[in-house]
């Protein structure tokens, strides 16, 4: 077994291999399609509204400011690009939460050798929605006060020198929580017990959270890395819990 902090890349690599397998592909493609349709729709709506706003604004400006129409649109495109980049992961995780819990459950079925082609059930998926969304709100409640505290810290001269590394460490820790919580929640482990278990596996958790954090920073690639992280986190759960002695692949 590799050193604890170095096991993260292995889990993510195996998770990616799992979600690309024929038996699990459907559980990945459906939430990806929903997220892509949603974002395309939001971008189209924003572009349409912005176009109406520009058309209404430009006639009221002096003629010598007409060049602004050529400046405003590129700025809008850049703004939308930044918004998509920074909001996609957060919004996609909330939308995909029931799918991710469902995917984690099916990955565990495959990993334990119960069924290489687990069946897809809409009824089973819908039944998971209230629980998984409540858990996402719990994560948000954990994240926000700490993020606000770090933001305030970053505004204090001199002290803010430690804010950047703390932000990075907190982001890595949140990635571990975000994804390992799916299999933990499937096994009805309480929020506090899950956090306590991750602290016991601190270095393994940070290693996994770190590689996921880096992978999700890559535009477009992060779309596939989210389900891969769910599968990798499920492998993390099964192996680190020691319920079964599953060999590394």
From Swiss-Prot:
Topology within the bilayer: Multi-pass membrane protein
Say yes or no: keyword Transmembrane present: yes
Which coarse location class applies to the principal site listed for this UniProt protein? membrane
Residue ranges annotated as transmembrane are 26-46, 71-91, 150-170, 206-226
What GO molecular-function term can you cite, just one? high-affinity sulfate:proton symporter activity
Q: Which GO terms describe its biological process?
A: cysteine biosynthetic process; sulfate assimilation
Entries under InterPro entries matching the protein? CysZ_sulfate_transptr, Sulfate_CysZ
- Cystine connections: none
Q: Where is the signal peptide?
A: none
Subcellular localization is given as: Cell inner membrane
Q: Which GO CC annotations does the UniProt entry carry?
A: plasma membrane
The record's listing under Pfam families reads: EI24 (PF07264)
Which keywords annotate this record? Answer: Amino-acid biosynthesis, Cell inner membrane, Cell membrane, Cysteine biosynthesis, Membrane, Sulfate transport, Transmembrane, Transmembrane helix, Transport
Protein's job: High affinity, high specificity proton-dependent sulfate transporter, which mediates sulfate uptake. Provides the sulfur source for the cysteine synthesis pathway.
Q: Kindly provide the name given to this protein in its UniProt entry.
A: Sulfate transporter CysZ
């Amino acid at each position: 077994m590799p050193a604890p902090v170095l096991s993260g890349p292995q889990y993510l690599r195996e998770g990616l291999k799992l979600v690309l397998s024929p038996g699990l592909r459907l559980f990945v493609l459906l939430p990806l399609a929903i997220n892509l349709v949603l974002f395309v729709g939001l971008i189209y709506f924003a572009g349409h509204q912005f176009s109406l706003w520009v058309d209404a604004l430009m006639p009221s400006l002096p003629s010598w400011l007409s060049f602004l129409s050529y400046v405003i649109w590129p700025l809008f495109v850049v703004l939308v690009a930044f918004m998509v980049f920074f909001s996609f992961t957060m919004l996609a995780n909330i939308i995909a939460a029931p799918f991710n819990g469902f995917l984690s459950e099916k990955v565990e079925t495959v990993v334990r050798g119960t069924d290489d082609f687990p069946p897809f059930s809409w009824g089973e998926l819908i039944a998971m929605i209230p629980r998984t969304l409540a858990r996402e709100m719990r994560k948000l409640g954990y994240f926000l006060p700490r993020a606000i505290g770090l933001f305030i810290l970053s505004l204090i001269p001199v002290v803010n020198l430690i804010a950047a590394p703390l932000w990075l460490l907190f982001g890595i820790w949140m990635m571990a929580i975000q994804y390992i919580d799916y299999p933990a929640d499937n096994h009805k482990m309480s929020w506090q017990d899950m956090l306590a278990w991750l602290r016991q596996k601190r270095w393994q958790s940070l290693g996994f959270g770190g590689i996921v954090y880096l992978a999700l920073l890559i535009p477009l690639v992060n779309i596939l890395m989210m389900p891969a992280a769910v599968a990798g986190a499920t492998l993390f759960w099964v192996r680190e819990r020691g319920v079964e002695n599953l060999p590394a692949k």
